[in-house]
Each structure stands twice: as C-alpha cells, then as structure tokens.
Amino acid sequence: MLKATGTVAPAMHVVFPCFSSRPLILPLRSTKTFKPLSCFKQQGGKGMNGVHEIELKVRDYELDQFGVVNNAVYANYCQHGQHEFMETIGINCDEVSRSGEALAVSELTIKFLAPLRSGCKFVVKTRISGTSMTRIYFEQFIFKLPNQEPILEAKGMAVWLDKRYRPVCIPSYIRSNFGHFQRQHVVEY
C-alpha cells in the first residue's frame, strides 16, 4: 500500500497520441510512478500494434428514439472491449470480481464522431497506453465496418480496488501480465 508522505507531486501531463485536444492532466503521487507503454503506433486499421480488436453488431434495443445507438451504450461497448482485452493477456475480470477485488474504471472520456444504427457491424479497438503502481490508462476506438469509418474515441483510467473497495496497488502478477504484453508488442516510433 502507498504510504502518505505529506507532499503532493505536481500534476503530470498525460498525452494520448490520437487526441489533438489539450492533454489530460492527472494528479499523481510521484512523477516517477507513471510508466508509458511503447506498445503502439497510431496507424489505424488492422495494422495497429498492441491493440485488441473485437467485432460487434448493433442490436435494436440499443437504439434511442432517433434510431441511433444511445450514447450510454457506447460505454458498454468500451467495457466489453476492456474485458476481452484483459482476458487475452490472462486477466479474467469475472475471477477478479469473485475474489472480492475489482478493476474499476474511474475515468472515461468519450468523443463521439459519428452514429451507429441498427444492424451496423463495428470493431472496438482497445490498447493500454500506460500504467502506474495504482492505475491503468487505456485508449479505445470504435470503427464502423467494413470501411473503418471512425465512430468513437475514448480514453480512461482504471484502478484496482480491494475487498473494501479502496484503491490499492495493482497486484504484481497483473503488472507482470502488462509487462509481458508490452515486451511482445514493442514498436519503434
């Protein structure tokens, strides 16, 4: 568990390379705790390195009164993409939940680019953009198939919670899984 020192580290700018807007400023306990992952390069399409992809299809009950996917449903798509990504690197979110602990999304920013309609097929792309001792930073994209039209960009942060739902350090075996994934997907900028 982190020990309080009574000092506050300055806010650290975290820049997500796919967003042209101002950087997300996240307060961190120490500027040395953030570890950016070098596992990605923004190339788009199926050639994106370090990215997990899952194809889905819009269901009628996900639509709003205007005939497009309700904005709240996109967060569900993102969560599903996160869970599937975690499973591919050996982390089963259901098992974590049954143990009484949780990996909880504490921040999620979504930029809507275009709507999805009933029957549209799309791909959710998820990648981890960085980690610290207590946080996981991720980026997600939704593209409409078959033409890869950008639908959504999202960025977020997840924290590990203990059985009392208090934030704690991410267990070493989880950090190890991320490290292993990073080593497998290192690319040059």
From Swiss-Prot:
The protein's enzyme class: hydrolase
EC number: 3.1.2.-
Positions annotated as active site in the UniProt record: D64
Keyword Chaperone: no
One GO location term (cellular component): nucleus
Single GO BP term: lipid metabolic process
Function: Acyl-ACP thioesterase involved in the production of fatty acids and beta-keto fatty acids. Can produce fatty acids of medium to long chain (12:0, 14:1, 14:0, 16:1 and 16:0) when expressed in a heterologous organism (E.coli). Possesses thioesterase activity toward lauroyl-ACP (12:0-ACP) in vitro. May play a role in cuticular wax synthesis.
Protein name, per record: Acyl-acyl carrier protein thioesterase ATL1, chloroplastic
